[in-house]
Amino acid sequence: MRTIFLGLAVGIGVAALGVAVSGQTQARQQGGGRTEPPTLEQMRRTVASLKGNRIATPNDYDTLTSEQQAYVRSILTGPRASITGPLGVMMVSPTLGDLSQRAMAYARFAGDPGFSIVPPKLNELAILVVAKHWSAEYVWNAHHSYGVRVGLTPAVVEAIRTGTRPAAMEQDVEAVYNFATEFIATRSVSDATLQAAKLALGGDRGVVDLVGTMGLYQISSMMVALDRTPLGAGTKPFFQR
């Protein structure tokens, strides 16, 4: 719980400071990166495509409140350029959703100017550890392939999926893996684990950014768990094999 609350505090603080959501480099790599405001028709189509499972996500743009419409516009103008998973769930609470999606963009597009300074490889490692902890199929599906694309080995990703310690890790990967798994398991980190993480992440800010990412993705995992958001058609579960 400490991780969740610290992550939320970091995220809301970032959003309150008005961190610019530009992240175009990684956004393009991940299928996003809109550079112009969405049209009314694009917003209507996006909302019409939403389908909550246990949470009644609205799917008629013309019935949205002004806050919900602003939430849709903000996401579609940002680096994601789409509303999926936890962002759809949070449509029912648009103020929380908007604060969260801005902070989550700060975390997700790590490495781009104005965003988290955590190297993308290590950022994705922490996200996958959180997804495994929560058995968050939706979050895992959104990140496991990208983790490999930014430098994690398939063996490390597969070990996290199966809940085993990776047999061989680079020094920075091992430091962040130890930090993330120890923090989640014990709600604390030893001095030695913290110091190793600081070396891997470039100091205090890197560690704080990493914990913010972990907290924010615990929120994401909880939202999709609340809704029991399904995987796409034809996608097999990752944690029930």
Q: Model-found features: residue ranges?
A:
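Acidic, carboxylate-rich catalytic segments that either coordinate divalent cations
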Residues: 198-199, 206, 215, 223-241
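Bacterial N-terminal signal peptides
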Residues: 7-18
